[in-house]
Amino acid sequence: MYKRQLDGAQPQWGVASADVLVEGVTEGSTAGLTAIFADVDSISKVGPVGAGRDLFLQVALPLNAVPVSIDKNIYASNLLNTLGYQDLDGYHIGKAAFAFDQGRQDAGYREENCWYTTGELIRTGLTNYGASAEGDNTPLFRFGTRPEVNPENRNGMNLTVTFSKTDSEQLNYNTGTGLYEKLNADGSPMTDADNGQQVGFTNVFVLYASSGIKDDGYTRQYDMTGGTGLYLQGGAWEQINWTKEDATGPFTLTDADGAPLTVAPGKSFIAIWGGYYGQGLTLTAADGSEQTLPEKPVLLESGVSDEAAAAAEEELSAAQRIIDAQAAVDQAKADLADALDELQEAQTACDADSENADLLAVRDAVQAKIDELNQTIADNQAILDAAAPEETPPPEEEQPAESEAETPAE
């Protein structure tokens, strides 16, 4: 189940009831999110439903899951078509499997953030395709009993996953519930719009994956064949390794020594993390000490180096500063014309009643406003002048050479 993540999509339905949440950047700077449910009948309401992406398909397909989305990009479409895998896409099946929350729109939410589905609607949609939700689920992990973590060994209490400079999210361990409680990028608790419950997980994974850019020059490409990573549970963390054969192959997780990783039963959060420019990870222990984490993954050949990304970011920022400065100058000049008219009116009133303190205060306030506008113009004009290309001086005219006839005789 792909969920919309952009501004205006929160709170989302079904995030607390999902068995697994998977998050990672597929394009732009905001991480995409998908929810995985073990039982379709456990889905009371989930959404707002977003567009499908192939990164999340590679997590869901090995589980024999039904991908549910409204539209999808070309890479997700190509993958499903190649495999002959039936999904449920609202772009094609419409209201047979999806519904619109009018009350949410009436509350001010955009239309695209009001579409949802339910377990019953999913079953109806699959029936329209002659498909069924019945079938065996493939376990995502090797579940089993893990040793209890002693308080003095809680070295993985607070995790910050920075997906971009504008999308940094936290998972904090609650010793009372034994869950990692998730916060939104703005620091607010991530809650379920269906029941108001805060989203929490028994297990948290950060899977390192080398990344680059696909051939459209925009969509993120990840090497999903394997890498290192982090596993957090019970307030402690350990380094792990993971492998995956292909798009339909399951994850194989091992501990640092290569032994199969035993995962505690419960809900799980998985972050796909490329470690490219603008991304970061911070993990602290119960005493606040920052942990030393594995080195970030190397870039794919199509990836952009940190140096090149920083240079491009600075170039973009410089261009934006010029745009902002010009807009500020234009606006200040327009406001200045009005302010000068106000000053003239205020001065005329003062001339007629020079002892009136209220009129003098109005005049002084207008003058202060004019001074502020002039300063705004000066400050932003300085930015424009500094960015303007230097004028090339005109070439010097060549002096004609003296002829031998004009050379005086000795």
Language model features with spans:
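Low-complexity/repetitive intrinsically disordered segments
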Residues: 1-2, 410
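A surface/extracellular/periplasmic glyco- and lipid-processing/surface-interacting theme
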Residues: 4-20, 27-306
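Extended amphipathic alpha-helical heptad-repeat regions
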Residues: 304-410
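Hydrophobic, Leu/Ile/Phe/Ala-enriched alpha-helical segments that form helix-helix packing faces
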Residues: 25, 80, 404-406
